[in-house]
Regions:
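Bacterial Sec-dependent N-terminal signal peptides
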Residues: 1-31
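Conserved Ser/Thr-centered positions that define the repeating blades of beta-propeller domains
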Residues: 62, 183, 242-243, 291-297, ...
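Beta-rich accessory regions
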Residues: 28-65, 88-90, 95-106, 126, ...
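Acidic, glycine-rich loop-and-beta core segments that form the ion-binding/anion-interacting portion
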Residues: 325-326, 337, 341-355
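Repetitive beta-architecture junctions, highlighting loop-to-beta-strand starts
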Residues: 57, 176-178, 235-237, 287-289, ...
């Protein structure tokens, strides 16, 4: 054997050895629906193959005989629709995956033939480049995975913070976690990933955040304090706090802070009530809203309930908000189902609030809807918004079909931000809703410049009508308009 050939073989052997030590995995089949898979890898992520038509597999991530994470994922059995990343970088290069498939899988073939075993891979980079035709441009969407209710929104130091209900292990509802995005203009959003993850108390359901300017909770001046529902065997309320402007959170050691025997007991919304110098909390409790008060954000006193006999009760009440508008108060109540055109929707009540009790000014049978479209739900406001504004953001979907919309890389979007106001008509007070000024500013940005000679412009990926205007110092103008529906160009010439 000559030397060059030998060198090539040694290099090839070295490459093979490197691959083997970088990602080694072997599975042990324990029954028709139970397996364990030991994974050794120096990479950051394990890619889990997902098949959306299958049932959920319960996965426990075990390190040094301790469960460090558990979640549900529709692992691929017949085919892989897409992959989701499991970050294992903090576990020292080796974990044991304990996988329990739902149901008895003997009817669809032997467990060792499931495609997930060959499609599980390791990588240092998860490709999140958009692959979806129907991803919105002006509406916030998750990079990948499932999203529903907006949560914990606040404004601080020129930045809008949006948290949201998130499933990092599939594009359908499951594994509720808080993920985080930020924006300086309410239109262009930067994704920051997961910030509050499930724990022994349960998954992380909806809630709110406040900026504790006076350090009433003792977590630090200007700490961001998040309130959320721990959805375990029972629904209880918990706290997490941040001292780095909402980038990371630490959970309060004495969670939960509120408990109840009501099954649907969730979605705490907290605000500072300047009129009575106290914190108030409103949350959904069955078919009503409970109101609490506190001086320190930790210890809460029950004050009253609202809802019995008022408005629409065609579904579960959830995701409340209580807002001061002028000399009135508005209580927002999201309901599912029961919307005017089916499914989920947002109703509201106008009245007075003294820090202890909300009193509706309308007759009990009156129902006021914030929006009559089907894709408007879980509407809540940004805390600490500037200039006294009330800025809200809805979830742009409906529980009738949210899990089945025609995307897979991600599912769901938020509606455009909107500012709320109050007006009167025929003796009744109503909430006015209009797109936030930031929305109009985004559409008003039109590139322009002076042409020195001829120019060639190539426009690609057009998703709406577009126009180009050419003009000169004489006031002559040529307007070219592309019609996205009929796919043709119209040219209008104005000469003097």
């Amino acid at each position: 054997m000559n030397q060059p050939i030998m060198n090539r073989k040694i290099k090839l052997l070295a490459i093979c050895l490197f691959i083997t030590t970088t990602f080694m995995h072997a599975q042990t089949f324990l029954s028709s629906n139970h397996a364990m898979k030991r994974v050794k890898t120096a990479d950051k992520y394990i890619l889990l193959p997902v098949e959306e038509e299958e049932g959920y597999a319960h996965i426990r991530v075990i390190k040094d005989n301790q469960v460090v994470k558990e979640f549900n994922c529709k692992l691929a059995i017949n085919k892989t629709d897409y992959n989701v990343p499991l970050d294992v970088s903090e576990y020292g290069g080796e974990v044991l995956l304990d996988i329990q498939f739902s149901g008895d899988k003997r009817s669809i073939g032997l467990i060792n033939n499931f495609v997930c075993w060959k499609d599980i891979k390791a990588t240092n980079v998860f490709d999140s480049k958009n692959r979806e035709k129907f991803r919105s441009i002006y509406h916030h969407t998750p990079v990948y995975g499932w999203m529903n209710d907006p949560n914990g929104m606040f404004y601080k130091d020129g930045v809008w913070h949006l948290y949201y209900q998130y499933n990092p292990y599939g594009s359908q509802w499951e594994n509720m976690t808080w993920a985080h995005s930020t924006s300086t203009d309410l239109i262009h959003w930067k994704n920051h990933g997961e910030v509050i993850q499930p724990d022994a108390l349960g998954t992380i359901f909806s809630g709110s955040s406040v900026v504790d300017k006076e350090n009433t909770a003792g977590f630090g001046k200007d700490a961001v304090v998040a309130f959320y529902t721990s959805a375990g065997a029972a629904q209880t309320q918990s706290i997490a706090y941040s001292t780095d402007n909402g980038e990371t959170f630490k959970k309060y050691v004495n969670n939960p802070i509120l408990t109840s025997d009501v099954p649907d007991f969730r979605d705490p919304n907290v605000f500072w009530n300047e009129e009575v110098k106290q914190w108030n909390l409103i949350l959904a409790a069955g078919q009503q809203m409970n109101i609490y008060s506190s001086k320190n954000l930790k210890d809460w006193k029950y004050e009253s309930s609202f809802g019995e006999g008022y408005g629409n009760h065609g579904g579960v009440w959830e995701c409340p908000d209580l807002l001061k508008m002028g000399d009135k108060w508005v209580l927002i109540c999201n309901i599912n189902p029961g919307g005017p055109f089916g499914g989920s929707a947002t109703q509201y009540f106008v009245g007075s609030f003294d820090g202890h009790k909300f009193t509706c000014e309308s007759k009990p049978e009156v129902t006021k809807w914030m929006d009559y479209g089907k894709d408007h739900y879980a509407t809540v406001s940004f805390s600490n918004a500037p200039d006294g504004r009330i800025v809200v953001l809805p979830w742009m979907s409906n529980w009738q079909y949210a899990n089945q919309v025609p995307t897979q890389q991600f599912r769901s979007a938020n509606g455009l931000p909107r500012d709320l106001g109050l007006y009167s008509y025929n003796g009744e007070d109503y909430v006015s809703v209009k797109p936030s000024p930031e929305v109009f500013a985004a559409f008003e940005k039109k590139p322009s410049g002076r042409l020195q000679s001829a120019a060639y412009i190539e426009v690609t990926n057009i998703k709406s009508n577009a126009s180009i205007v050419l003009s000169n110092d004489k006031g002559e103008r040529v307007t070219m308009v592309f019609d996205i529906i009929f796919k043709f160009l119209v040219c209008v010439v104005l000469l003097f």
